[in-house]
Amino acid sequence: LTRGAFMTSYRTFGKSVPRRDGIDKVTGRAKYTADITLPGMLWGKSLRSPYSHARILSIDTTAAENVPGVYAVLTGNDVRGILYGRRLRDVPVLAWDHVRFVGERVAAVAAENEDIAQAALDLIKIEYEELPSLLDPLEAMKTEAPLIHPDMLNYVGFPETPERPSNVFVQDIYGKGD
């Protein structure tokens, strides 16, 4: 077979590429981190905000703390000021004064197993004051719009610190050639 004949007879497009882990995944033999249980291991679960924008008025964790098998219950007050993010550290580990999106973490539980952790989460009582949501980017850019990130001057990771908090941030990086 000549090189030219081989190249015209062999086709890669339109063919399935077998995955090395495919059989294990479809048969249920594959192991994921959620499948691993170690002696003495604790399970963690988070309680998340049902509101897109709200002030946290109170959090009562008393009942959750008294569930047998619960080792710890944390709220934003326990980790106040600790922020994370890939480049700009602007996401609280747990929200403490207000929430900015549906699903933002508000409390966390560590327990002996997943069911106990969930039962404890279900007992946490949170009182919110729902605030107006900014759903339109043009409305969010107006001077009188409520700030999405009122603490932004304390964030780590800005290429240059803004002079005052704002919902508008512009950064341009240009390059030319090599």
Task: Annotate the PLM regions.
Residues 2-177:
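Flexible, low-hydrophobicity surface segments
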